[in-house]
Every structure is written in C-alpha cells, then in structure tokens.
Design a protein with these regions (language model features):
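Extracytoplasmic small-molecule ligand-binding "clamshell" domains
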Residues: 27-102, 110, 261-264
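Acidic, polar ligand-binding/catalytic clefts
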Residues: 66, 70, 75-138, 210-221, ...
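Ligand-binding clefts/hinges and TM-proximal coupling segments of bilobed small-molecule sensing domains
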Residues: 154-168, 204-209, 239-291
Length: 293
C-alpha cells in the first residue's frame, strides 16, 4: 500500500472516530419501537393537529413531532386509525406515539408516558352564532355532540337533562350540528376553530367555557395541556421528546408553528396557574414550558 492510500485510510478512520460518538441509534438510547429507528405515529386525521402528507407530518403537533424526530434520528411512519382506538394502539405496541391535540389527564398519565406540553387549551361550546352558548347551564336539556374517548365525557354527562351523541370524527359531528340533529358540540378546540375559519358561511361560533367550575375541571378548566402519549416502556423516548419540545418553547418557535395553523390566541401558550402535573408524572419542582420572548 503506497503512502497516499495510507494517508487516505488514516483520514477516513479519523473522520469515522470523530463522527461515531455523536451518532447513536434508537436501540442504543433504549427506545422501545415497533420498528428500529422508525417512529410509528397514530394518525387520526384532524387538522390542525397532526396529519400525514407525502410521508411527513404536518399540523401544529405534526410539525413539532417531525422536528423532534429528525433531531433524534428517527424516521416517521404514519399509521392511520380512528381516535377511539389510538390510545389502545400505543398501549399494546402497535404504534409508538399518539399526538394531535391529545389532552393530559391524571388517568392517562397512569397508563401512558406523556411528554411535556406542546400547547395549552380550554374547552368550549360550538353552536350557531345567534345562540352563542358558553356556560354549562347553556347545555342543560339540549342535544349535544362530542367525540368518543374524550377525557371530559363523564363530566359532560353530569349536565342536567343533556342528551349526548358521540362521534368518531369532528367532521361527522359538525355535519350533524349543521343539519340540526344536535344543538351544540363540545369537541377539540383547535380542530373546530380551524374548520370554522375555513367555512365562515356555516354561521357557527366556538366559545370557551366561562364557568371554570371546579366540579367540572376537565370540561371547563383553564390552561389544560396537549401532549404526546407513549407506552410506559418508552420513558426514555418520552423524556427526549420533552427535551426537544422544551427547546421549541425556549426559542418561541412554537408560536411560529402555531401561526401557520391559526393557533394565535395567547391561551394556546399560557399554562394553568395550577401546576397540576408536579408530583403526578413530573418532579415536584417541574414547571410547564412557556415562551418568554
């Protein structure tokens, strides 16, 4: 072997040594994935949360998860499914993560590893503009629609005289509202706001609950959190996703992402005054992320 070849080989070896320490596979990070180095994502199909286009994720949560996955060296694999079966799919290992306006609850935290919040929200009532309902009392003795599997359903069922219809998609619920088969809808705020903004001729309005009733915390509470949910075996990946999410909050890139999808209200970026995750699925000194710029 001549000197030139020896020098080329030495340079190649030096380059590989320089690169390899910073390159770790998902297996080396102890991620529990359906496929090695691939992040299988449950896609329930509602904008502006998380949908797949041309093999990549889009939507508010979609953009965040796409950025995080690329930073962690993971390839995205979208897996379409109904929302009603998505959490079970994560728990049984058929997909790795669920996102797209998934609300944190204490009950879900007992069975899933949940990331730091991608955003914040408050539920509301969708109705005809001339109704303009925004309180629990407005829903009494009315036909109301909501979504299968939503965390606040037990509270919604406690409203006096309320007749509840459940749907597997926001589109189906909105169609029934427009057709008069239900009088109001309590659904996914960003999805409904997005749909109404695209269809002003519907004559609908989505108004946040003004009750903030402590007896109905999941239904009317302020500053609730949207998160990504993973299996309990995937705490390492959940922690790494949280680090990537927090970086997007620190840089305020979350607001730039939100701007693309109509998430412009300060409520989308303002946590609850009550730090309800501290001591539950986070350390007691944990604080929810904010954009301070």
């Amino acid at each position: 072997m001549n000197n030139r070849h020896i020098l080329m080989l030495a340079s190649a070896l030096a380059l590989s040594v320089a690169i390899l320490p910073g390159m770790t596979s998902a297996a080396e990070k102890n991620y529990e994935l359906v496929e090695p180095d691939v992040l299988s994502v449950a896609i329930t199909g509602d904008m502006p949360g998380l949908v797949a286009r041309d093999g990549k994720l889009t939507g508010y949560d979609g953009d965040i998860l796409q950025i995080a996955a690329e930073k962690l060296g993971l390839t995205i694999k979208p897996v379409p499914m109904e929302w009603s079966g998505a959490i079970a799919a994560v728990q049984t290992g058929r997909v790795d993560v669920i996102g797209g306006n998934v609300a944190w609850t204490k009950q879900r935290a007992e069975t899933l590893s949940m990331s730091d919040p991608t955003g914040y929200f408050q539920n509301g009532i969708t109705s005809k503009k001339d109704a303009g309902w925004h309180t629990l009392k407005d829903l009494e003795n009315r036909k109301v629609g909501s979504m299968t599997g939503f965390s606040f359903l037990p509270e919604l069922r406690k409203v006096a005289g309320l007749e509840l219809s459940l749907y597997d998609s926001t589109d189906a619920a909105l169609r029934d509202l427009l057709a008069g088969r239900i009088e109001a809808l309590v659904g996914d705020p960003p999805v409904i706001d997005y749909a109404i903004s695209k269809n002003p001729d519907w004559g609908l309005v989505n108004l946040a609950f003004t009750d903030n009733n402590p007896d109905f915390p999941l239904l009317t509470g302020l500053g609730r959190q949207y998160v990504f949910g993973l299996s309990k075996e995937n705490t390492g990946l959940a922690a790494d996703l949280s680090n990537q999410i927090r970086a997007l909050w620190t840089s305020c890139e979350v607001r730039a992402i939100g701007q693309r999808y109509g998430n412009v209200s300060d409520a989308n970026y303002t946590p609850s005054a009550e730090n309800f995750r501290a001591g539950v699925d986070r350390p007691t000194d944990w604080l929810p992320p904010t954009c301070t710029k």
